[in-house]
Every structure is written in structure tokens, then in C-alpha cells.
């Protein structure tokens, strides 16, 4: 399985791919253009080469605001190609995603609606403490199937369907990080 990222992508992507078991040899770094954006033609070529060599493209990770240069990958073109090729598309908007709250910066996310998941970090621009992140997913059921476990001691007595956020990530529990962002929005508004 191959993971495709821009050569400008954040190092956490490589770390995550290693943790997920892909191995560094399956992380394909796609060249960037003069604006530090992923070269879509190079991406298409690498995917075609890998398919011809018997590899399976699993995921493309596009970046909306690279940490080192602020580069913005052409999400619309990348999303269209991922849809054609049936490849999962994740958008790493950790650094610049908070700017999407402002109408004048929403052009950056053109094409992001074609992504399967997107993450941004309010702690970088929106006055929240460290580790406040927002993660959008198109298909929550796929995420839940990945992380869900239900040993006897976690079974509840309710017959009413509830959302168990323990099934949305590796830890079974976590701090209420969303409260940080809620307080900022309540205190300062969205305008």
C-alpha cells in the first residue's frame, strides 16, 4: 500500500504512516512546483507507475498550508484524480485551516469537499491550548469500524443508540478539548 504526499508535507505524516505500518519505503514524496504546491501531473504519473509495478495506492495526503512554506496543494485537481482512481484523500490543513473561517480565505479549500477527511488545528491560530484539533470525516462508519472494540466491561445498559467517541480514535477516552474552542467562539464570536 502506498501513501502519496508532497515533498513539502509535515513530518508527522511520515511518522503516522510508519505507525500505521506502511513503512517508509511506501511513502511516496511527490515533487512540488514553484509555489511549493504538490505537482498534480507528477502525482498522476507516480500513481500510474506504482499501479503498473503492482503497488496499491491507498491514500493521498494533500496539504492546505505547509508548515515550512505555506504551500497550498491544488485540492480540486487532486480530489478529482483521487475520485477517478478510487484513492482515499486526506487534507492536512493543520497549519492554515483556521483561516477557512474567514470568507476571504475560503478559496484555499476549493476542492476540499472532495476529501474523505480533513484536519485543522485551532491551537495554532485560534487562541486555544495545545492539542485542540478538529477532524472532519466523510464516512464516520469507516472510522468507527477501524477503532471500535467492545469488550464486556465497555458494554452499556442502554438500548438507545449513542455516539461513543472512544470508537473514533486510538484512546478509549480523552480530554474535552472541544470545550477550549467553544469558549473562544463564545467569547469572541465568529465575526
Predicted ranges, named:
Residues 114, 131, 148-150, 166, ...:
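A generic structural signal for well-ordered coil/turn residues at beta-strand boundaries
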Residues 125, 134-138, 161-191:
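Structural motif of enzymes handling amino- and sulfur-group chemistry
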Amino acid at each position: 500500500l502506498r501513501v502519496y504526499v508532497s515533498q513539502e508535507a509535515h513530518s508527522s505524516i511520515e511518522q503516522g504512516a510508519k505507525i500505521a505500518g506502511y513503512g517508509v519505503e511506501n511513502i511516496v514524496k511527490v515533487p512540488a512546483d514553484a509555489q511549493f504546491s504538490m505537482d498534480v501531473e507528477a502525482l498522476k504519473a507516480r500513481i500510474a507507475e506504482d499501479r503498473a509495478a503492482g503497488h496499491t495506492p491507498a491514500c493521498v495526503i494533500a496539504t492546505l498550508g505547509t508548515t515550512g512554506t505555506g504551500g497550498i496543494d491544488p485540492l480540486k485537481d487532486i480530489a478529482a484524480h483521487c475520485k477517478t482512481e478510487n484513492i482515499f484523500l486526506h487534507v492536512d490543513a493543520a497549519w492554515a485551516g483556521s483561516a477557512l473561517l474567514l470568507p476571504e480565505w475560503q478559496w484555499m479549500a476549493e476542492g476540499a469537499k472532495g476529501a474523505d477527511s480533513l484536519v485543522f488545528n485551532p491551537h495554532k491560530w485560534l487562541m486555544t491550548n495545545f492539542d485542540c484539533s478538529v477532524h472532519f470525516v466523510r464516512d464516520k462508519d469507516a472510522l468507527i469500524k477501524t477503532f471500535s472494540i467492545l469488550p464486556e466491561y465497555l458494554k452499556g445498559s442502554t438500548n438507545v443508540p449513542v455516539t461513543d467517541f472512544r470508537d473514533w480514535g486510538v484512546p478509549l477516552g480523552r480530554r474535552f478539548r472541544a470545550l477550549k474552542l467553544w469558549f473562544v467562539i463564545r467569547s469572541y464570536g465568529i465575526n
